Amino acid sequence: MENLGVGEGAEACSRLSRSRGRHSMTRAPKHLWRQPRRPIRIQQRFYSDPDKSAGCRERDLSPRPELRKSRLSWPVSSCRRFDLENGLSCGRRALDPQSSPGLGRIMQAPVPHSQRRESFLYRSDSDYELSPKAMSRNSSVASDLHGEDMIVTPFAQVLASLRTVRSNVAALARQQCLGAAKQGPVGNPSSSNQLPPAEDTGQKLALETLDELDWCLDQLETLQTRHSVGEMASNKFKRILNRELTHLSETSRSGNQVSEYISRTFLDQQTEVELPKVTAEEAPQPMSRISGLHGLCHSASLSSATVPRFGVQTDQEEQLAKELEDTNKWGLDVFKVAELSGNRPLTAIIFSIFQERDLLKTFQIPADTLATYLLMLEGHYHANVAYHNSLHAADVAQSTHVLLATPALEAVFTDLEILAALFASAIHDVDHPGVSNQFLINTNSELALMYNDASVLENHHLAVGFKLLQAENCDIFQNLSAKQRLSLRRMVIDMVLATDMSKHMNLLADLKTMVETKKVTSLGVLLLDNYSDRIQVLQNLVHCADLSNPTKPLPLYRQWTDRIMAEFFQQGDRERESGLDISPMCDKHTASVEKSQVGFIDYIAHPLWETWADLVHPDAQDLLDTLEDNREWYQSKIPRSPSDLTNPERDGPDRFQFELTLEEAEEEDEEEEEEGEETALAKEALELPDTELLSPEAGPDPGDLPLDNQRT
């Protein structure tokens, strides 16, 4: 390109411009499943350093811990948050075809939101990466395209890095084009004066591009082809969480118990236990029917003339109506609804929601059939179970209803999808026995045998919920077409199975990867033009509703906490009586309620709701504020007892240890070897004479220094 004439240089620039235009105007492929009613626009969050606002066009190349160049502006208390609505960062170049005079309006977030903590997902994962190059990409690309938007999922980081490479190559080509155009006829003496600045800039961009390519190649070369890109984020988040929980387990005995509970419940950790012996009398019989069902043949069917206003008979109908006025609001007091509805909160709330959304008319659901089914369904929730009863189902269903109505999701989902989400939330814990999946597996229960230890309770809830439709006058889907019915069943199954808490980290990683990938590739537009993307959002929506207790007003949250702990303690008592090891947080003599809630918020609820808030920004900001306030309340209630403090270096038999897979163990060994080699090299470098240390040839690469020497 150095010998291009004026005409050829202009033609090359024109080709480059057309190429960039085609790249920026790339349209999404035609839908594979159905056309979405409206795409979701993901608003990008920016964390800007006030000291750098004047020079936002300049790329930060200052050394940082473990980084050769800046890839992330870590959130600190002094940082101010900015939201970019339908616009681009201040670093957008004027030549970028994606920029326009109408874009780029920066809106400062309200003050209460600016100081909110970030979840553990934004912490460094460098201690667990496979190579020094990978270690240089702990977070997002601070590029002109993305400003300082924080990106933490590996696949989105790869895409962002490749876009930076493309931008650099385009800039190099543009410089060559401009240089050729200015050079004019060969032999023009003035052209030599323009070369040095272009060469300096070109060398800088070339080195930066090589660095980006090296990191992308490293990520892609270590990607296991049989796993999805979402698993890259899932594995990364699990490694970070394991490290955080290990630190927590070293602080105290109660911290150790909280760590073990979170790991076993939300990380799908399998533990080996000694199962009780099965005697001849206890030997399970062949099963041909769903257990736990009763009253299918002689249900108390209602007639259309006798259907109460809210589906339940109550002498406090007016008070109930007043309470249900808050059905569309976050934080409905379902305990009060239960009192006013004769302990039928699920029936009253679902009946009210279906009327509010006009679903009875849309799907031709007879009111008496709906009321009969809901009463039958609620009757199969166990009133003697402290937490997983019809109160919880009603709360999750109402929370799902409110989340579906969030402005960011307006007109996104079809009526059938909304019906499926509400139905899934209503049945998601029906016939729950008040014990965990692991308890059923450990006790060789009938349900565990029937469902082969895989999402035992979730499969059972689905079976019961659908089986009840076969009772007399209970088929609320009788007027759906065969195609609609199959589609609804598929969605409900996917959503209820996703409420298995052992799948939490995979759900979270997939959602965060989706959100960040769309930020990088589509200017924040999430089209949801296929079933996989749409059901992923719905799964996370119901999962958020299922884990919404910490986002509710504190009086409600405390009642839910009391109930879940009572259920845990009941399971612990049963385990103690059966001679089994007591599950984490189920021993009423040692469990710390306050620490359990702080740990649950820090490592489970906060990362999930933070990611959901990114998807629907700014609609969930108040929920995050409530979550933070509730965490601080429980944190303030943790007893400061000296007897609870233990030696962090203790190695007692009750200390929780994370089990590593064979693959993770090999990675740990490789990291230890690399760290030892790097430490030895660093020591040799430090022993060199000062003159050699000042020499560029003798000095070690900053990226090769051990971690401790890079931290500032």
Swiss-Prot record:
Chief subcellular location: other
Cofactor binding, note field: Binds 2 divalent metal cations per subunit. Site 1 may preferentially bind zinc ions.
Compartments where located: Cell projection, Cilium
Gene3D superfamilies: 3'5'-cyclic nucleotide phosphodiesterase, catalytic domain
Tissue spec: Expressed in various tissues but not in cells of the immune system.
UniProt: Mn(2+) binding residues: D429
Ligand binding (3',5'-cyclic AMP): H388, Q597, F600
Pathway: Purine metabolism; 3',5'-cyclic AMP degradation; AMP from 3',5'-cyclic AMP: step 1/1
CDD domains recorded: HDc (cd00077)
Phosphoserine sites (modified residues): S73, S641
Binding site for AMP: H388, H392, D429, D546, Q597, F600
Domain PDEase: 312-641
Task of the protein: Hydrolyzes the second messenger cAMP, which is a key regulator of many important physiological processes.
Protein name as it appears in the record: 3',5'-cyclic-AMP phosphodiesterase 4C
Recorded name of the encoding gene: PDE4C
